[in-house]
């Protein structure tokens, strides 16, 4: 029988899981929400992969939490895919993050027009999104169907990503739109470029009281960042709407059927923290769809132009299959790590597509980290 890295080096993660209330790594990192398969397909004989995307507003503690979780496993058992900081600062463009914050500041000070700011922001967001989108495309051929047996073995590999492509292709553009430095047309152009959602896409969003969030962000030192409280409020709002949108879609919501329930073109007020899938289906007015009832997108009869409606169809199609989890960051770094480990027990694995997929994926992740990680 072929041997895969996760089968050889699972003991470190097993021990960590047991010490935190899991019987073994099988329960710590094996999905619960799976259905029994009636017959075994060739794909189901392949090892499984767990992909976890740690996302949400900047400054919550995502990177620290992720690094602590990764430290629980062996090098071949769990692989971390960091933010592509070197690409943003050097390879893709010069100091992209600093350029974004400087442009917003100049707009806020009246030094440049909204149109000039939008040109810079749109270009910068292309740079921010490129590493995520291309990595997703390279990974896609190795991702098979979601594991279909409650008796599936522990994953041969766990990949922990610092953000999903929707961060750069949806959430941050939408927040910049709320800040007045990007057009709604540009936001929907990015939406049209979001890659198809792969099976087993587990996204972890965060909850943290705003005052605590501001305090953490003020203490953080990232190259090029400014403490922009208006932007922090905007991105918190967008991620809250994102969580609501996934719940809305998975609860059977249809933006086309409910569009008439939106009134006016006002931006939704500040929302509460992202919520789990529990509770009633959100109103369309509490989802991302409400952002796009903008005059620039509407025909004279008040309906969306078809090209923009098609973009919202893409948005719905991309978000509906996602498995969203909420992590409470209002605790110590170790507490956040343990809570994240607990969340993984309910996440969805996928089979890989070839016997060589696991080492290929490992190599892809390490190449990404080596070439574009912050240490470069």
From Swiss-Prot:
Transmembrane spans: none
A family per Pfam: Herpes_TK
Keywords noted in UniProt: ATP-binding, DNA synthesis, Early protein, Kinase, Nucleotide-binding, Transferase
EC number(s) per entry: 2.7.1.21
The reaction(s) this protein catalyses: thymidine + ATP = dTMP + ADP + H(+)
Molecular function terms, GO-annotated: ATP binding; thymidine kinase activity
Positions bound to ATP: 56-63, 216
Biotechnology: Used in molecular biology as a selectable marker to identify transfected eukaryotic cells. Used in cancer suicide gene therapy to selectively kill transformed cells.
Ranges annotated as biased composition (Basic and acidic residues): 33-44
Basic residues bias spans: 19-32
Active site: 83
Residues at which substrate binds: 101, 125, 222
EC supergroup of this enzyme: transferase
Chain spans, region Disordered: 1-44, 260-280
Biological process terms in GO annotation: DNA biosynthetic process; TMP biosynthetic process
Similarity remark: Belongs to the herpesviridae thymidine kinase family.
Purpose of the protein: Catalyzes the transfer of the gamma-phospho group of ATP to thymidine to generate dTMP in the salvage pathway of pyrimidine synthesis. The dTMP serves as a substrate for DNA polymerase during viral DNA replication. Allows the virus to be reactivated and to grow in non-proliferative cells lacking a high concentration of phosphorylated nucleic acid precursors.
Further remarks about this protein from its record: Phosphorylates and thereby activates certain drugs like acyclovir (ACV), valacyclovir, and famciclovir to a toxic form, that leads to successful suppression of the infection, while the uninfected cell does not have this ability because it lacks TK. Mutations in thymidine kinase may induce HSV resistance to antiviral therapies in immunocompromised patients. The most frequently observed resistant strains are unable to express TK and are avirulent in animal models of disease.
Assembly mode: Homodimer.
Protein name per the record: Thymidine kinase
Organism lineage string: Viruses, Duplodnaviria, Heunggongvirae, Peploviricota, Herviviricetes
């Amino acid at each position: 029988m072929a041997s895969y890295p996760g089968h050889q080096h699972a003991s470190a993660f097993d021990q960590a899981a047991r010490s935190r209330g899991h019987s073994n790594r099988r329960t710590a990192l094996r999905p619960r929400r799976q259905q029994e398969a009636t017959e075994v397909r060739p794909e189901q004989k392949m090892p499984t992969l767990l992909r976890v995307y740690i996302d949400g507003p900047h400054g919550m503690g995502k990177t620290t939490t992720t690094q602590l979780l990764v430290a629980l496993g062996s090098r071949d058992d769990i692989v971390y895919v960091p933010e592509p900081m070197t690409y943003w600062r050097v390879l893709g463009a010069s100091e992209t993050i600093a350029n974004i914050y400087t442009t917003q500041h100049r707009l806020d000070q009246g030094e440049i027009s909204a149109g000039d700011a939008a040109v810079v922001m749109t270009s910068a967001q292309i740079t921010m999104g490129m590493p995520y989108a291309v990595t997703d495309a390279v990974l896609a051929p190795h991702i098979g169907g979601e594991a279909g047996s409650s008796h599936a073995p522990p994953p041969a590999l766990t990949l922990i990503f610092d953000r999903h492509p929707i961060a750069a292709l949806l959430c941050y553009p939408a927040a910049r739109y709320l800040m007045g430095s990007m057009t709604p047309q540009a936001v929907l152009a990015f939406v049209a470029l979001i890659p198809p959602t792969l099976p087993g896409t587990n996204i972890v969003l965060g909850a943290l009281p705003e005052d605590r969030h501001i305090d953490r962000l003020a203490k953080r030192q990232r190259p090029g960042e400014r403490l922009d409280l208006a932007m922090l409020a905007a991105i918190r709002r967008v991620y809250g709407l994102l969580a609501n949108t996934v719940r809305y879609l998975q609860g059977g919501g249809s933006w086309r059927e409910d569009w008439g329930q939106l009134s006016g073109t006002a931006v939704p007020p500040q929302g509460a923290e992202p919520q789990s899938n529990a509770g009633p289906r959100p109103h369309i007015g509490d989802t991302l769809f409400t952002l796009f009832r903008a005059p620039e997108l509407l025909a004279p009869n008040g309906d969306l132009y078809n090209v923009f409606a098609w973009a919202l169809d893409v948005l719905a199609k991309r978000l509906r299959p996602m498995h969203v989890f909420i992590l409470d960051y209002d605790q110590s770094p170790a507490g956040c790590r343990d809570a994240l480990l607990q969340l993984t027990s309910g996440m969805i694995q996928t089979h890989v597509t070839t016997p060589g997929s696991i080492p290929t994926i490992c190599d892809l992740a390490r190449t990404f980290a080596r070439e574009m990680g912050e240490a470069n």
